[in-house]
Amino acid sequence: MQQAPQPYEFFSEENSPKWRGLLVSALRKVQEQVHPTLSANEESLYYIEELIFQLLNKLCMAQPRTVQDVEERVQKTFPHPIDKWAIADAQSAIEKRKRRNPLLLPVDKIHPSLKEVLGYKVDYHVSLYIVAVLEYISADILKLAGNYVFNIRHYEISQQDIKVSMCADKVLMDMFDQDDIGLVSLCEDEPSSSGELNYYDLVRTEIAEERQYLRELNMIIKVFREAFLSDRKLFKPSDIEKIFSNISDIHELTVKLLGLIEDTVEMTDESSPHPLAGSCFEDLAEEQAFDPYETLSQDILSPEFHEHFNKLMARPAVALHFQSIADGFKEAVRYVLPRLMLVPVYHCWHYFELLKQLKACSEEQEDRECLNQAITALMNLQGSMDRIYKQYSPRRRPGDPVCPFYSHQLRSKHLAIKKMNEIQKNIDGWEGKDIGQCCNEFIMEGPLTRIGAKHERHIFLFDGLMISCKPNHGQTRLPGYSSAEYRLKEKFVMRKIQICDKEDTCEHKHAFELVSKDENSIIFAAKSAEEKNNWMAALISLHYRSTLDRMLDSVLLKEENEQPLRLPSPEVYRFVVKDSEENIVFEDNLQSRSGIPIIKGGTVVKLIERLTYHMYADPNFVRTFLTTYRSFCKPQELLSLLIERFEIPEPEPTDADKLAIEKGEQPISADLKRFRKEYVQPVQLRILNVFRHWVEHHFYDFERDLELLERLESFISSVRGKAMKKWVESIAKIIRRKKQAQANGVSHNITFESPPPPIEWHISKPGQFETFDLMTLHPIEIARQLTLLESDLYRKVQPSELVGSVWTKEDKEINSPNLLKMIRHTTNLTLWFEKCIVEAENFEERVAVLSRIIEILQVFQDLNNFNGVLEIVSAVNSVSVYRLDHTFEALQERKRKILDEAVELSQDHFKKYLVKLKSINPPCVPFFGIYLTNILKTEEGNNDFLKKKGKDLINFSKRRKVAEITGEIQQYQNQPYCLRIEPDMRRFFENLNPMGSASEKEFTDYLFNKSLEIEPRNCKQPPRFPRKSTFSLKSPGIRPNTGRHGSTSGTLRGHPTPLEREPCKISFSRIAETELESTVSAPTSPNTPSTPPVSASSDLSVFLDVDLNSSCGSNSIFAPVLLPHSKSFFSSCGSLHKLSEEPLIPPPLPPRKKFDHDASNSKGNMKSDDDPPAIPPRQPPPPKVKPRVPVPTGAFDGPLHSPPPPPPRDPLPDTPPPVPLRPPEHFINCPFNLQPPPLGHLHRDSDWLRDISTCPNSPSTPPSTPSPRVPRRCYVLSSSQNNLAHPPAPPVPPRQNSSPHLPKLPPKTYKRELSHPPLYRLPLLENAETPQ
C-alpha cells in the first residue's frame, strides 16, 4: 500500500523564505476589491496567507495531476455549499484565461513553486484552478471579516477580527479545522503563549482584558450585590460583607489602572518603541493599591464563605426574593455568583505573570526599571496569595469554569474549536450538523450518571449543545469496530431545554434535570456536591447569560441618565457651546478607522475643543492641526487658547452642593465627581499631549519666538496634580533636549550596517580645491556629494514652510528658509551644468562634458536622487543646450538612450517618475516640484473658509489635504545615505555661483550667444576651436573601486552600477504606457476647479493661461513656463519669480526629426528651389541633411505666407495617445518645473510653428523652449567629422528668427553674493592651458 504523502512544511526554516509574504500584496488587492472602504493591517494579511497555504497543502495531499483531480478533492474536503462556489469560481477563471488573467493572486509565481510542493510538474491550468480556489476562499474570509469590522464600527481589519469572524462562520471553521492541518498552531491555550507577543501587543491585549474584567466586576456589584442590598431586612450588612468582601475596592483599583494604561498609550511619543506601562504598575504597587486582593482571596477561598453562603441560600425567603427579581436569577445567584467571585483571585495572578512578560519584552531601560520595581513591590502580595491558595487548596479540574464569566480568552476559544472537531471524530454514530456549525465554545466535559440507565455517561458541554455519550470499552482493538472512543446516546440543543435544580432525596443526590419543550425530561446526577456545582454553574451561566447581560446594561444606562455629565455654562467657558452648523461641520458619511468623525470645517474655538475632546483622542487630527494651524492662527493665539481650554471652571453647584458649602464642607456630589473624572481630567491630559507634540515636532515655533517658549514653560511649571506630574516632566524634558540641541548644533552621528565607500578621486586630488571642476572630479563622487547635499537640504524642509504657500509670500525668507535654500541650490546647479556645456568651445571637449554629465545622471539614478536627475534633464533641455544638435549626435548611442530614459520620467505628468518613486526603497531625494505643484493647486483651488448660514468656518478639509502632501514629503526624510561627506567638495558645491555678478537676463543672453558661437544656426559642422584642457578627457567610469578598497556600498543597497550593465534595473522606457496615472498627493477636493479660476492670472495662481505668443527664457527648473496644448504635458524651465509683464515673442525653433533614408529617396525628385545647397561630397559622402523647415531662397526679409507644415512623426502605436481632459496646469513664483525633455532627442508640436511675420528677425535671439514631441534629427558624421576636422561648409539658409531683442526676463527676488570673478573671463576648466 502506497504511503500517504507528508504535508509540505511551508513555514519551516528552510521553506519560509520562499513562501512567506508571497501572497500579501495580492491579498491586499483582494481586500480592496471586496471592501474598498476598509483597510487591512499586515498582520491580518499574513494570517490569511498562512490559512491559504494550509488549504493549498490540503489540496496537494491528493497529488492532483488534472483539473478534475483538484475538483474532486475540493468536493471531498470542502464543506457544503462552499465547495460548489469555489468550483464555479475556478472554472470561470479558466474560461476567462483565454482572454486575460482575471486572478489577483500571483499564478505565475505559484505555478513553478508547486513542483516543489507536489514533487512533480503540473499543467498550468491545474495551477490556475488551484489558485482560483485559494483566491475565492481568501475573498470569502476577507468579506466575512470586513462585514464584522463594519458592524463594530471599525475601519481596519485586524488578525483578531478575522479570527473572531471565522469563529462565527461554521463552514469556514469546519473547512480549516477538520484535520490536523487546521488551526493547531494558533490554539495554544497556555498563558505563556502571550509571551510570543511584542510589548505593544501585550499592552493592547491587557487593555481589552481589563475592560472585560471591569464588566465582570460591574456584574458582581451592580447586579448581584444590588439584589442583596435591595432588601435590607432580609440581608444584614454583615451578610453582604461576608459574601462580597471588598469587591468595591477591587473595582476602584481596576478603573484606576485601566485609566493609567489608556493614558500612557495615548501619550506615547511616536519615537518611542512602545508605550511605557511600567510606571502605571509601579505607582500603584508602591501605594500598596493591590493589597485588597489579599483580603478578598482570604475571604472568598475560606470555608466560612461557602458555609455562610449555603446557609443564606437555604432560607426560603431568600429563594423567593431572588426568584421575584427575574426568572432563573435564584439559580444564577446560587451557582454563578460563587464562580464570579473567584475571577478577581485568578486575575491578580494574571498581573504577576503580565509584569514578567512586559519586562522581558520592554526595549526601554527606564521602563524595565519601573517594571522591576513593581515586581519587587508585589512580591509580598504574591507570597501571601500563594500561601492562602495552598492553605485552602481549591481543586480546579479541567471542567471547572473559573475562567472569566463572559467568554473565554481568545486562545482558549481557538483551542475549544479544535477540541470540538476532535470530540466529533471520537464519537461514533454522529449524525446531523457538525458541532462546529452550531457551537462556538467548548465549555467542559466529565462523567455523569443518567438516572435510569445502567452505565455512566460521558458528557460534553458546548455553548450550543450538550452531548451524552457512552464510552466504547475494549472494542477499539477488535477488527471491524470503529476507533472512536465514545458512542453517541443523546444530543440536547441548549436553547430548547430548561435546567431545573433537584433537591437531594433518598433516590438520588447531587442531581439536576433537563426538561425539553415537549415536556420530556432527563435527570443527571454528579458524584459530589462540588461536581454538581460546577455543572450547574456552567449550565446556568449559558442559559441565563443574555438575561444577566440585559440586567447589567439596564443598570448602567439608568446610572448614566440619573447622573448626567454637567458642564460649565457657555457664558463662562466657551468650549462647551453645543455643536451646530454655525460652528462646526463634519465630512458626510466619512469616519476614520477608529470611528471618529472627520472635521470638514469649524471655528477656531470648536477646532481647539475637538483637538482636546473629552470623549476620544484623535492623534491624526493633532498631527494635522499642528502642521497647518499657522494658516489661520498665530502661535501666540494657539497657546492662549490652549491655556484657556485647560483652566476649566466648575459647573454650577447643585442644591446638595450649596448645602455642603453653607456648612463649610467641600461639595462631593456624584455628578461633580463624574465631571472631574470624565471631563476635566481627559481634557487637561489631552492639552498636555498637544503641548508635547508641539514642542517635539514643531519646536521651530518656539525658536522663532522666545516669548512663546517662556509663556509655555511658565504655564507648564504651574500645572499641579499628581496625575499630570509625569506628563509635565515629559514636556519639560523635551524642551531641555531641544534647547541643548539648538546650542550644540544638530548631531549627525548615524550608525550604518556597513561602512560607507571611500572617496573617489580623478584628476583633482585631495586638498587641490582650486582645481575642482566638472571634468577634474570623479563623476561618482560628484553625484555622491551632490546627493548628500541635496538629501540634507530635502530633509531640513519643515511642513510649516509649505502650508499656505508661504514660500511665495512676502515673508518667505523667514517662513521658508530651508525650502528656498533647496530651490536656489537646484537653480544654481542647473545653470552650472548649462554653463559647463556651452563654455566648452572645442567640440571634443563639449562632447566629453556632456558625456560626463550623463554619467553623473546615471549615478544619480542609482542613488535614487530624482531631484538630481531632473536637474540634469532641465539643463539638457535648456534653450542654450538643446539646440546643440552636433554635440548630441556625437554621443554614444547607449548614453543617448540613458538620457532619453531619464527624460521620460518627466513626461505625462511625471507618471513614470511616480511609479519609480513608489517602487524604490529609501534613502532617496524625491523631486520637490511635484509636491509644490500639488500644494499650490490645493491652496488656490479651495477656499480658506466655508460659508455656513452666513458664518465663515475655517476650511479644515483643505488643510488636511495639504497635510497629506507634507506627510508624504516627510516619509522620505527619515533615511540618510551611507556616504561620506568630503568637506572641500561640499564647500565647492555649496558655493556654486555660475552667474557671478551678472543678472539673470545677462547670464541667459551670454549662454545663448555662446551656444550660437560654438554651433551656429543650421551649420553642417561645428566650428573649430582650440582645446582648453591639457589633461585626458577620458572618463574614469562610474564603477567604484570596490575591489581595491574593499568598500561595499554607496547606499545601503550597494553602489550603483551603470544602467546598461545592471541586468535587473528597471528601464523607464519599459513601463507600460497603459498604466493608470499615479495620484500621489494629488488634490482630491471636489472644490478644486478643473479649469483655471478667475484669479488664475494672479501672481500666485496655480492655473496659468497658456499663451503661445509669450515665453520665458530662464534656465531654472523651479520656474514657471508656458506650455503648448499638446498631447504630452511637460513642466518647463523658467524663472524663480513671476513672469515679465510684457514678454517679447521669441522665434519658434524649427522642428527636428531623424533622417530617413527611404523618405529622402522617395522625395528626391520633388526637390524645390527652397532647399538648401547640397553639401559637397566627401569620403565617405554623408547623406544630405534636410532643413528644419522650408525657407525661401534669397534675402530673408519678408514674412512667410503660411506656417511651415508639422514635421513627420515617428510611427505611433495603433492606440491613439491620451487626450488631456483639461488645460495644462502650471504654478508660478518659485515652484519646480522642468525644461521640456528631449525624446530621442525631442518632439515638437505644430502649435509652436508660428508665422514668421509675428516676430522680428534677429540672429542672436534665443529661441523659445522646444516642445517635447519632435525627434531630434540624426546627423551621420563623416570620417572627417569623427576626426574632428572641420572643412568649410557651404552656406545654409538662415533660420526663422524673431525679435532683434531678447525676451525680457523677470527680476530676481533675492540678491546673489558676488563670490566669483566676472562671468565672461571664467573658463570651463580652471586648470586648463590654452594651446598655442
Swiss-Prot record:
Stretches of Basic and acidic residues bias are at 1153-1170
Ranges for domain Ras-GEF come to: 778-1017
Which CDD domains does the entry link to?
HFD_SOS1_rpt1, HFD_SOS1_rpt2, PH_SOS, RasGEF, REM, RhoGEF
| N-terminal Ras-GEF domain span | 595-739
Tell me which residues bear Asymmetric dimethylarginine: 1321
Q: Where is the PH domain?
A: 442-546
Q: What is the effect of changing residue 1092 to L?
A: In NS9; uncertain significance
Cross-referenced InterPro entries: DBL_dom_sf, DH_dom, Histone-fold, PH-like_dom_sf, PH_domain, Ras-like_GEF, Ras-like_Gua-exchang_fac_N, Ras_G-nucl-exch_fac_CS
The annotated regions of Low complexity compositional bias extend over 1078-1096
Using the record's annotation, list all stretches that form the DH domain. Answer: 198-388
Q: Where is this region: Disordered?
A: 1018-1061, 1076-1096, 1142-1332
Would the keyword Membrane be found if you checked this record's keyword annotation? no
| Name this polypeptide is given | Son of sevenless homolog 2
Originating gene: SOS2
